[in-house]
Amino acid sequence: LVYDPDILLLDEPLANLDAKLRRYMRAEIRRIQKATNITTIFVTHDQEEAMAVGDRLAVLRKGIVEQIGTSDELYNVPKNAFVANFIGKMNFFSSKAGKSGDVIECKVANDGPVLFIGKDRAHTEVNAHDDVLVGGRPEHLFVTKEKSEKTIPGKVHIIQHLGSFIRYEVDVDKAISPVTLEIDMDSLQK
């Protein structure tokens, strides 16, 4: 920064710092970026770090750009399964699509409920009986002991208390990988 560069290139600048110092330095780098208005290319394999520091992110796989966008765009509207799972955790399951107007019907597992997903959430044209891959973020799911037509039976096999939230790993069906759920402590208090 002493030489007033046009572009600042940073290759894993926080890689060897402990977690607390990394969080502090993320904020400091962001502050410097804003104060100097300098274009910065920040290479990191830490998705949380990228989302905290970057205005626009590029997700690469084997040297190919998969998606460019804001952290919100990449997290909430990923272009494909790779980006979805790279930017945060995503639970996936395969299903056969059915249609009902402007929604796609997807059955979860053998005993599971039918999800109704808006066609605007699909990344490609989906027709009835197409094989589809459906993804759901851990924070959009919850654990309950009550059975209903909207629940998926499963067995909790790992519980991790991680400060502000609890992460559950749940086996739901032999055909589906264990499902991850994250429930914040505030919602458990209610």
Where are the predicted features?
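Short acidic/glycine-rich beta-turn/loop cap or linker motifs at sensory/regulatory domain boundaries
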Residues: K62, K96-G101
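Non-catalytic connector elements of ABC transporters
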Residues: M90, K99-K190
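Structural detector for hydrophobic anchor residues on beta-strands
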Residues: I38, R56, F92-F93, I152
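Short low-complexity stretches enriched in small and charged residues
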Residues: E49-V53, R61-I64, G88-N91, E125-V126, ...
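Residues located in well-ordered beta-strands
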Residues: T70, F82, S94-K96, P153-H157
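Short, electropositive, low-hydrophobicity segments enriched in small/polar residues
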Residues: Q67, E73, F92, R167-Y168
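ABC ATPase nucleotide-binding domains
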Residues: L1-N85
